[in-house]
Amino acid sequence: MKRTYQPSRVKRNRKFGFRARMKTKGGRLILARRRAKGRSKLTVSDEKKKY
């Protein structure tokens, strides 16, 4: 059986990246909450590139 998690950087950033969050009202609310909480990484696209 194929595992459910098949990682892809492109798909991940398109779905959960900063620009994807900024597109919707709900996404902007998520960013606002994470800023208020003091998160160093707001979205997955803020993670350091491994290469």
UniProtKB/Swiss-Prot annotation:
Pfam families, alphabetized: Ribosomal_L34
Gene Ontology CC: ribonucleoprotein complex; ribosome
PROSITE patterns noted in UniProt: RIBOSOMAL_L34 (PS00784)
Keywords on record: Ribonucleoprotein, Ribosomal protein
InterPro entries given in the database record: Ribosomal_bL34, Ribosomal_bL34_CS
Domain of life from the UniProt record: Bacteria
Gene3D superfamilies for this protein: 1.10.287.3980
GO MF term set: structural constituent of ribosome
Biological processes annotated in GO: translation
Family to which this protein belongs: Belongs to the bacterial ribosomal protein bL34 family.
UniProt cross-references to NCBIfam families, sorted A to Z: rpmH_bact
Record's protein name: Large ribosomal subunit protein bL34
Organism ancestry: Bacteria, Pseudomonadati, Spirochaetota, Spirochaetia, Spirochaetales
